[in-house]
Regions:
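Flexible, membrane-associating and regulatory peripheral segments of lipid-active enzymes
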Residues: 1-87, 291-301
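Composition-driven, intrinsically disordered low-complexity tracts enriched in small residues
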Residues: 23-42, 172, 177-194, 269-273, ...
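Serine-dependent carboxylesterase/thioesterase catalytic core
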Residues: 67, 91, 114-214
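Short N-terminal helix/helix-N-cap motif within the alpha/beta-hydrolase-1
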Residues: 73-75, 101, 175
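Conserved alpha/beta-hydrolase
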Residues: 83-103
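Catalytic nucleophile-loop/oxyanion-hole region of alpha/beta-hydrolase
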Residues: 103-119
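The feature captures the conserved acid-bearing segment of alpha/beta-hydrolase catalytic domains
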Residues: 199-236
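C-terminal catalytic-base region of ester-bond hydrolases, centering on the histidine
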Residues: 221-301
Length: 301
């Protein structure tokens, strides 16, 4: 029933669509209702996982999209994946972190984060081998913006990744209430909490995992970091816990760009202002200047 209501809300509300400038371009739909209604987690989002794609001189590094806790590549990247593809990037996405059978019902990102980082490591190696690119760029939402830091710091990823962009990443943890809210949003998520969701416990402020991750500094040399966050994040709380410290970090608060952006944690992948910031982080020589238009919680726009 929730999925029916979600789809209906997209029909009754304005589902922002970027007009395709060329016939070959993929539609980019900035709507959380549209995106989160996708129920085929194994299906690659539009534009992703073309293993014949070769990077260009303009965009020499493939982009790997990393979803968050309880989510999957299909429901997370229905906007950003085609947007990147339309703008000339080779785009790849994965599902990771199945635990205690969670992947069987389409719930990912619940397993131990160290193991998820190993899955990401193997996937990036596969992408680099297929594309011939020595380095990749990573874009992640929620846990997907934080987990790659373990790969960069402890698994040799610093020599394989140029840029990490986090959308509301749980870099310094959150509260039990924040994780619980997230679990209730995704169908089946509430079945995989507590002991059935090691990643949930590891993202709580004060966990041993976070202490190890952040010991010795937030970043590693040679990697560029961008954090994009909303003041209205109700999952990563306080919202400032997403931000990183370091000379190679750019922290962006969306409301400093647009006071009409009321987007929350769930709307981040479907927020056209946040997604424009992603493009700028990946290609800083060609900065984007998105229009300041209303962005709604959960829905985006």
């Amino acid at each position: 029933m929730r999925r029916v209501l979600v789809v209906l809300s997209c029909v009754l509300s304005f589902c922002a669509v970027v007009a395709a400038p060329a016939a070959a371009d993929l539609p980019v739909i900035y709507s959380g209702a549209y995106g989160y209604a996708h129920t085929t987690p194994a299906a690659s989002p539009p534009g992703a996982n073309d293993w014949t794609c070769k990077p260009t001189a303009a965009h020499p590094r493939p982009v790997v999209l990393v979803h968050g806790t309880f989510a999957d590549m299909s429901n997370s990247w229905q906007a950003l994946s085609p947007l990147l593809k339309n703008n000339g990037w080779c785009v790849f996405a994965l599902n990771y972190g199945s635990y205690a059978g969670s992947g069987a019902i389409g719930v990912y990102g619940t397993g131990e984060i160290r193991n998820s980082a190993k899955e990401l490591d193997a996937f990036v190696d596969k992408v680099r081998a297929a594309t011939g690119a020595p380095e990749a760029d990573l874009v992640g939402h929620s846990q997907g913006g934080m987990m790659p830091r373990w790969y960069l710091k402890f698994l040799g990823g610093a020599s394989e990744v140029h840029t990490l962009v986090g959308l509301s990443p749980s870099n310094h943890g959150t509260t039990v209430d924040g994780i619980g809210l997230l679990a209730r949003f995704f169908p089946g998520g509430s079945q995989f909490t507590g002991a059935l969701c090691p990643a949930c416990e590891e993202q709580i402020v004060g966990s041993q995992f976070l202490a190890e991750l952040n010991s010795g500094g937030d970043t590693v040399p040679g990697v560029e970091y961008t954090v994009i966050q909303t003041r209205y994040d109700q999952v990563v709380t306080p919202y400032t816990s997403a931000f990183l410290s370091g000379s190679n970090v750019k922290n962006i608060l969306l409301q400093n760009q647009c006071i009409l952006d009321l987007g929350d944690h769930l709307s981040m992948p479907y927020d056209h202002i946040a997604d424009a910031d992603v493009l700028t982080a990946l290609d800083p020589l060609h900065p984007r200047n998105p229009l300041c238009t209303p962005i709604l919680p959960t829905e985006g726009g």
